[in-house]
Amino acid sequence: MTKSLTSRKRIRKDFGRIPTVAPMPNLIEVQKSSYDQFLQIGVPVDKRTDSGLQEVFKSVFPIRDFSGKGELEFVAYELEEPKYDTDECQQRGMTFAAPLKVTLRLLVWDVDEETGARSIRDIKEQDVYMGDMPLMTSNGTFIINGTERVIVSQMHRSPGVFFDHDKGKTHSSGKFLFAARVIPYRGSWLDFEFDAKDMVYVRIDRRRKLPVTTLLYALEGAAATALREARTAEGRSVDPSEIAGMTSEEILDFFYQKLSYKRDDKGWKVDFKPDHLRGVKLMFDLVDAATGEVKIEAGTKVTPRAARKLAEDGMTEMRVFTEELVGRYAAEDMINEASGEIYAEAGEELTEAMLADMEKAGFTELRVLHIDHVNVGPYVRNTLAMDKNTTREEALIDIYRVMRPGEPPTLETADALFKGLFFDSERYDLSAVGRVKMNARLGFTMQEAPDTMRVLRKEDVLHIIRQLVELKDGKGEIDDIDHLGNRRVRSVGELMENQYRVGLLRMERAIRERMSSVDIDTVMPHDLINAKPAAAAVREFFGSSQLSQFMDQTNPLSEITHKRRLSALGPGGLTRERAGFEVRDVHPTHYGRICPIETPEGPNIGLINSLATFARVNQYGFIESPYRKVVEGTVTDEVTYMSAMEEGKYVIAQANAALTEDGHFADDLISCRKASDFEMVQPQDIDYIDVSPKQLVSVAAALIPFLENDDANRALMGSNMQRQAVPLVKAEAPYVGTGMEAAVARDSGATIAAKRAGVVQQVDATRIVIRATEDLKIAESGVDIYRLQKFQRSNQSTCINQRPLVKVGDLVGRGEILADGPLTEMGELALGRNVLVAFMPWNGYNFEDSILISERIVSDDVFTSIHIEEFEVMARDTKLGQEEITRDIPNVGEEALKNLDEAGIVYIGAEVQAGDILVGKVTPKGESPMTPEEKLLRAIFGEKASDVRDTSLRIPPGVTGTVVEVRVFNRRGVEKDERALAIERQEIESLAKDRDDERAILEGSFARRLKELLIGQKVVGGPRGMATGGVISEDLLSGYTAAQWRQIAVENDETATEIEGLKKAYEESIAKIQERFENKVEKLQRGDELPPGVLKMVKVFVAVKRKLQPGDKMAGRHGNKGVISKINPIEDMPYLEDGTYVDIVLNPLGVPSRMNVGQILETHLGWACRGLGAQIGALLEQVKRGLIPINDLREKLDDVYGPRHAKEDLAPMGDDQIKELAFNLRSGVPIATPVFDGARESDIVDMLRKAGLDSSGQVTLSDGRTGEPFDRKVTVGYIYMLKLHHLVDDKIHARSIGPYSLVTQQPLGGKAQFGGQRFGEMEVWALEAYGAAYTLQEMLTVKSDDVSGRTKVYEAIVKGDDTFEAGIPESFNVLVKEMRSLGLDVELGQSSF
């Protein structure tokens, strides 16, 4: 693999032994592909598949009016260009969306009243605007009202049929009651269940249960199907009263086999079938009908082996006594055809009297149901006997009464309701997934029931009941609802599709009513459509759905993890309270699909999961994982993606199974997975092998080195805490990584990657300009301008800042990293810093996971981060007049206004602290009665004296920082102030610079291509002074400007045509650039769309620098978290023998009980990386001085990296590249130790030896305070530490006076409300226990809700008096009011005690 520009500058030594065959899919593919399939933007209208938005429109349209005269058809839809780009939407607080235009066709029919025939009278087609459709950004997010949001994918139970039992919990006997449930994608649920008496019932939508035979009677029988076919052939319809349901005989015939008993002079005999006797205890002797011999005596239990032996011995029929037939069930009606007398009906139990009558009547053959009460139970037959309904009409009316209690049923309405429940595609939809799942469970083929058949069929119902009965008889298995074959993922596209369908259905009703109320001949489609319900449904989904979440933008990893999250919560999913242990637990099918580690701690554990690294979602919504095919014990490079259902059939080996050079398994027995179990299997029996060892964990877990050495609970904390790492001022990639860092940085969109190959023309801190060298389409610009984000605020108030990595003149390839983003370094994710750690106790300052850090960490800004706070103020139009943003604020001194410009807005770069004014604003006061003085002033000066109050935007407590950006928004038509105009001018200058640069590069490339075409051609015309007839040379052209070259005409027609095409393309490109510039300028100058009543809005962004301080939370990657207890002076820290002071001291007792040994291995390996880096740095210095040849440096690098890297990466490098690589390795050699395939203990020892360090990883440390060495050696090394988003500055808070609750008059709680500390019930008990009566009284009255008392106390304190009197607390008055509301009249009287 060729290394990119950035990865060549610093190569990560890889300890992985297993080669990666399949590339890891793009990490945000889940979001992007789903929404692309929903919108189908790039697909031509005629090639769109029936999915997503197209399917929604097709399923709702055509809409017909009630009379049948008008019909509104859907033709096509088109998404136009979005009005604003993503940056503009974020700045203006708008939604990034494209207008949706739908082409509709209105058909008007003429209806012949006599015959009912219809003919088309008129067709009108029109484009109708149907609201805006939010678009996904290139990073897989949505911008809704200016904020970035993510739609989380939802896990839900797949549609289909599921068989289960109650685990013996329902009935006191502990008997298993089996049930089957048909879950459609939308429509009514159908449940089949047994009760304690073994009767089979059916429930529709969890209503009252009905005997299952009622449902079967309601289904069409064979006779009705034949009648329907005959009528259809004649072109006539069938009346519901003519349709006959299934008969008792048909029902019994489907569920039971028939046995035919024949009568001869010796009695009854029947065919001998070994299967029918399996496990049966004989009531009578088993007699061979042919010989009369007793084969097995009565009372014996027949084993399958004995029954099989009898058949092998030639027994074909057995003799049956008449007594044995008593209690059997007739398989069909037994009728005397001569007299018409009925002896037994189908399903009726045979008695001795019946048999005697039949014998008299001369019956020689008797057909009975094969029910032996052992292998086959009489459940359906008993239900049939118990059912009061016997015909289809009775069954339909019974179903109608259950579904619509209280309404009078008729056969027509009952028939329509029943058909609408399960057999009407508009109301019932199994979905393609549901049909595929049902076919697989019931054994149907795709030919019998294709996935377009989305309603239930009679065969489905019958087979479900049959399988349920077989389960009861002990055949088959119940379903595991937590198996990933029974749970599927609904991604953005599908969630959006469902929501849009809801909106369109609301719209449909309105359209239908409007079609009936207007003159259909004169209206256009536009007049019938009101798109508000559809637009409202979309807005509601993105704005308030549980699955539409404010994106976690703390760092690139948290973004990517949020987009890959799978939630079992949300509409149509589970709730926290109802979810049991089984749903939350790790299931064997999670392997390679859902990460078993990354899930939140707390009530959501196991309900919110993360997709595994290599997993992808297939067209049916099931998660697939990749495997390499194994053919006859040889591992191939063919990769197959399989869902959990498909995987169950195969034997799959682990990725770390030992292989030989030629791909054979090295061992005779291999540990493999088969259908959720582990087995030892021979190589030739293996079907597949895992693609990579990291395919079973999520992205965050795959970033933890030595994950295999950490306890699962700590790994969970480690993967969760990496998402909380704050972007630091200087990012540093870890010495000990896993190789996933570059993939996360690339796919998260934090870095900037080149869209196409080219040459870097210009670079500064805000943009990179590249002249493209590939994909040069004639009509397109050959220039790519990448704007870098500078100090932008993220959703979590962290800082987004990008820095260029390339230089002018660099050749870059497609996909190469051009700029680093927040928490990335050289294109790799860099969540924290490598610091020198010692594991030892230090004066109790690392007790209970506390962390002791060196002052160097603070002074060198190692863990300093920048946070950007946003403050916003609006000037509104109030009833009393307009608010004004101004510098002229009443009763405010000049000192407080020093940072404001003449418009009253703070300067960029001003250093501000709590209480400072950011934007001056005044609000009109209501008219108040004037004092004589004011009257005098009014009379003299003729103006109001200060009738405004100060409502300026001030900095809240606890914030100190620098103003980095100001944005001013003006309503259209409102005059812009000087500050707004200055910002606008600056923006326009920046756009003009982009335009001019793009033009210049375009002109250069045009001139070059024109020159190539002109040289060697014969001149036939040109600018003044150019002789015709001569041949064009480079010297000739150098005498003219590039603009004059365009006037040259050449003799060769072909070249002339080519030159004309080139000129045309150039002019079009220049025009496009100018048009784009003018559009953007026009948008800037136009004014903004502000909320109603707002005239002006100002946003001020303040950057706050947060240094590390005691109380901040830090963590490693192994769940080793702690709070900083003390920042120690450097000279007091323990130091190494060479005088190096350690940066951080951790408690060694935090390791054994937590079992996260990975941190110790990381420390040792980091120590070796640092040592090797120092050696390489020393050699580089010698090379630069000319003391040693560069080959010595090459040899050292070859030794460090090993033969594989030396051959692939180092050998092709030139001397300058080797020097640059060595320069970047001075601080430490980065290594990758992939999860489950990382560095072994021997590798760590080897690295330590190469670095010239003690292989134990321990050194003698000395105490910085005394200079004495510590008693024993200490583990020292480099560990990667993160600073988490739990900063003490955000949490510390104090209040003296502040806001109070309206009802109780007690202080509010929480920092956001500037509240107080709650003195709770238990604290009151403590004061009571100590007998501190006065303190207690103070707490319960004047410090809480004694309104008059607290005012008096304040006054007393101001006067210097320290006595006070407590009054009645307000909460007592609330209690009295509460009691009065209960009807208890409580009055307070003065007592004379």
From Swiss-Prot:
It comes from Rhodospirillum rubrum (strain ATCC 11170 / ATH 1.1.1 / DSM 467 / LMG 4362 / NCIMB 8255 / S1). This is DNA-directed RNA polymerase subunit beta. The keyword Ligase does not apply. It catalyses: RNA(n) + a ribonucleoside 5'-triphosphate = RNA(n+1) + diphosphate. Signal peptide: none annotated. One of its GO terms (cellular component) is DNA-directed RNA polymerase complex. The gene is rpoB. The RNAP catalytic core consists of 2 alpha, 1 beta, 1 beta' and 1 omega subunit. When a sigma factor is associated with the core the holoenzyme is formed, which can initiate transcription. Its EC number is 2.7.7.6. The lineage of its organism: Bacteria, Pseudomonadati, Pseudomonadota, Alphaproteobacteria, Rhodospirillales. Belongs to the RNA polymerase beta chain family.
